[in-house]
Amino acid sequence: MADLLAGAGIFDVDVDDAVADEHVRSSAYRRVVLVTASSRSRGRDRAIVAAILRDPIEMVSKSAVVALVDRIAMKVTGPAEFRQWSAELLPEIDQLKAERHREFIHRRVHDWLFYLSIEDGHMPTPVELAKVTDWMQRVLAEESTSLAVLALLDESGSRKKIRNIAKNRAGSRKLRAQ
């Protein structure tokens, strides 16, 4: 824990408190993730993920790793860069004992690859859309500026709420003017 915090330049966390209290540790991990994601270099990411994943409470470590995945996905230049970055982390992620935690992170990576491919110009099919989580469908319904993607979500979204968000956004004057 001390090395992880020092490597991120975080010196105001009591290491003994962090070791003893999962809430303090979780907060420290969030700060480490913020520093790590804001760095231009991705060279230390795998080691940082490995250190976080050694936490005795997998839910705490999984949450921190998912936060890093989310932040990096929003920084990369496209799906190829994210695919390469995430592939480097998968051996560490696959060390998680709980299969549900491993699967959750793998699904999140898949979701972001789907999102980034759309941002890169790919128009998904209903079958491809069905393979992403409700969470990602909602992100797309709320953020996509593509009328074609919104129409797909309106027709094939997995939940009524997703379909309604997409339908309402597709009909907004602001979006149609773009």
Feature roles, as predicted:
Residues M1-Q178:
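Alpha-helical scaffold segments
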